[in-house]
Amino acid sequence: MQRFTSPLLCHIIRRGCFDAASKRQCLHYLKVLRSLQHSGFNTVFLGETDIPESLITGEKTAEETSLRWPVWTLVHAASHQGWVPWRHKLLLRVDLSTHLQNAIFQELCESLTMSYGKCVIVTRDKMQPMHVGAEEGKEPQLGTLPPATPAICMSSVESCREAARANGHELLVVPSSYNYLYPMAVAWSSLKWFIINNRKDFALRSIGNNSSYRCILFGDLIVKGIEKMTPNKWKVVINRVKKWENYYLDTLS
């Protein structure tokens, strides 16, 4: 029995320590977020999602599992008022060099300064796995889709934090066990379901003598999908996030 009970006890102790540490991390995150908000910082959520070719075409290929197969990455940000007035970035993931990633983040910071003044930019660490649910409960989603790739696309949270502060902003990372405090997953779900349901309407077919071609208006498809996440929908989603924030501030304090 000794060899069986010891691993079990060890698992319970480790899990308990992890949960306690996770709760402290969440409370610290929420207190810092509230402090910045009370100091006049506007909250902006920054995220990214990968869009595989099969999602666009509706045709799955064996080559898509290869790391060399091209995957598009969409980067955007939003506030309680809706998508921020900044042109989203749609790039091939292989083209996202460190220099380009930093340039994108710098451009966003400058745009936020012009539109909102000082902001607290909330994102997920690129090393964090994305969990749709959480231990205490699950947020309803718009549908079941493959998990989003971790954000942020920027090479280093620390370098982005320095860039944010240089522009008068602050950067916060949502604790990994509380990703439903991060509303971008709902927006990406909305976008991808729009792509699935409407991709045929954005495809043109040309038939020649010996072959046929299909042209997909990819950029237009993405823009229309983004527009489906309206300011009113953003308001509902972020109000839900605020309720969770208030709940954990009360229960974890």
Which residues are covered by each model-predicted region?
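Short functional hotspots at interaction and active-site rims
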Residues: M1-S253
